[in-house]
Amino acid sequence: FKDIPADRMGPRVRYKESIDAILSEPFDTKLVKPCVESKVFGIGVEAYTVGSAEFSLSYAAMNKDKCLPLMDNGHYHPTEVVSDKIPALLTFFPEIALHVTRPIRWDSDHVVLFDDETKEIAKEIVRCENGIDRTYIALDYFDASINRISAWVTGFRSFQKALLDALCQPSEMLKELQDTNQMSKKMVVMEQCKTLPIGDVWEEYCRQCGVEAEGWFDEIQKYEDEVLSK
């Protein structure tokens, strides 16, 4: 609702009944992964969102055999971070799903970058027990003001870099330092990790995949000039 509702529970009961009806249809849970996703607010629904965080998470918890909790890091209050929520959910759910995006003040779906929260999300996926195998990752962004192929490549590669960066860090060592209360050394090692040469590792990864590390934009520019602009 755009403004203050008179009945907050009724729409949620109807929403629950609707999802129940959808999930009552037979499907192969190995091939189809239904998800429930929350949102704090949106344009036109500033006062009340039926699928709140509490509603969606509660529904997923009560229906683990039929659906997964899905978190979009643009769907929460600006002071909340999805990276902190990942280990919380993986403690209770066998699998979770993510929409990785880049919010600016609200769920603006800007192109994913290799920024702090993107890196933190990747770290938690890697550091949680079997997190990579238990997390379904989708990228959720669009910016019509820039070349959409460039946007697609930039966002996709940014999260690949974030995962690669997380995989290169000494996670087991850091966990041991924390568990043995060596907090000063943990801080020092975590700071050292920030200046590790991830660029060199990324270039080698791209070389092994048979693609260019950073020289791809010229091809996109040529395609824009010769095809998209016609």
Please give the residue ranges for each predicted region.
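Acidic catalytic motifs of isoprenoid enzymes
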Residues: 82-83
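Active-site acidic/histidine proton-transfer and metal-coordination neighborhood
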Residues: 1-64, 68, 173
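Glycine-enriched alpha-helix->loop->beta-strand junction motifs that scaffold or abut catalytic
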Residues: 64-66, 90-96
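Alpha/beta catalytic barrel-like cores
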Residues: 10, 25, 30-32, 43-49, ...
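Histidine/acidic residue-rich metal-binding segments in metalloenzymes
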Residues: 52-62, 88, 120, 125-127
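Short, glycine/acidic-enriched loop or turn micro-motifs at the edges of active sites
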Residues: 74-75
